[in-house]
Amino acid sequence: MRIAWLAFLCLFSLFTVSGPEVTGTPQSQPQILIGSIQVTGQKRFSSDHIVAASGLRIGQPFQLDALNDAVNRLGDTGAFEFARYNFHPQAGKVVVELVVQETAKFHKCVFDNFVWFSDKELQERLRREVPLFDGWAPEAGNMADAIGGELQKLLREKGISASVTHTVYGALGDKNWIYLFDADGAKEQVVAVNFEGAATVDVVTLQKEAVPLLKRNYALTEFRIFARTTFIPFYRERGYLQVKLGDPTPKPAKAEQCLTDCDVAVTFPVAEGLIYQWSPAVWNGDLIATVSDLEKIMGMKQGEVANGKKIDSGFDSVRKEYWRKGFIDVQIKPNTTFDDTAKTVTYAVAISQGPQYHMGELQLLGMSPALTGKLKTLWRCKTGDIYDGNYLEEFTRQEFGKALRETQTRATKIETRPAINKESKIVDVLIEVK
């Protein structure tokens, strides 16, 4: 700040007029005003938004304390790695320059259950009242709190009795987590689920898939997951391999305004796309079977509806065929080509089988001698044999239960752990009873 203070003294001298001593009532020194505010260094935000967030205004008195407060205010948002200022005189006023460097870490803001407002309304309100809001908030700083505070203010204006909270939402270790904002304390029971754009599918059957959503409190994040795990597979099973569902749109189900407790109607926008038929796959790479045999394993026939669920199961069966022959690192990469004119889909499948693994040692822990002996007798994958990657699951599901019954053993928990040695290409298997 020493440099800034010296600059201020020099600046002050420019506005001070020297002259002969005057007796009588002293006149006050005229105020120095900010004539313009410039911003440099920014990429994400506009100059106007940064100036608004700083709290500075053109025409206000020039004061160092105000400049210090402005850069501190910018820093507190968390949106900047640093913020500083320069200034110089121009035409009897002061030009202020805010020099910033924006942070790289921002996270998307998601509004989970504000059913009283459209997403557009929320976005417009926050962009107007929180100067740096652009749908995202920095990882550090107070901007997320400012967003929550503005949402709380909006609820109060509408007479809605709910408390706004925000949490970090995402899978453990996921760097792309989101800020999730909730209106806690609001009862928002879903009474209807609609599909906008569902024109060719059997809507009655689709509605049955949506029944689990009824009588639940609305939450965008939960409904997104449900759509991805239920509605998308529903369409793919019927050949709609390029179906797309947008985010659900909630709104009060009744015409009159609701406050805290609302019956909610939810609409999913759907772009169904075409119903595709299967065209024989093109197989490339490390093939351990003939193309004809691979097609049989897939279980698909030319001209039949390209059932996405059946196709996924077919590729899983092909993978298991490689596992059965010891290729447990196999990589199967299907690439789709859609012919919208013929309404067909062709998969070009590249296979890299990787190394072949062999069986190492079988370890049995926590068992009686009788059970240990029985399992060793039943286990057919011997040391040195090609390791069957499917066998451990099959053995646990079938032979293990048989051995428990024959030895009259009760097991509350069974753990299986294959130990894969990438260097020796050996797999040791441990089975433990707890």
Predicted features and spans:
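Bacterial N-terminal signal peptides
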Residues: 6-16
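Signal peptide processing junction and immediate N-terminal pro/mature segment
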Residues: 15-27
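Interaction-mediating elements
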Residues: 24-434
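Positively charged n-region of N-terminal signal peptides that target proteins for export
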Residues: 1-4
